[in-house]
Amino acid sequence: MKHIGIAAITAEGAALVYRNICKMAALRLGDYCHPEISLHSFSRHVHANEDRLSVWADLILESSHKLKASGADFMICAANSTHEVYKLVEKSLPIPWLHIADGVSHRARAQNLQSLLLLGTQYTINSGIYDQVLSVSNISGARR
């Protein structure tokens, strides 16, 4: 079983994804069974009001190295906006970072969905984080 690393950009997102991983694993593997999970978090004030791209890129790189050192095979991040730096750091990461839009696209294809409604912050809506991944899968997205 793979060791999952969670880049905890927001406490809410990290807690939700951790809880869901454990719940889904229990359904598939049995009660109290889940993969090894490591979480790395920065205090939100470090990145909340800074130049997003440069600060986020540095934070994700640092987090990925710490998660790898903990034994993680790959990392995930439940914060939509942070994925804007994915292309900037992808090749420099010591472990794979699973893109949030790839997960959404995979799930949509599995359910034969052809269009999705994206709800989020203005930053996420305007960033185009989902556009390329969804278009490759021929899934259209509306924004609100």
Model-inferred region functions:
Residues 1-144:
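Non-catalytic structural scaffold of enzyme domains
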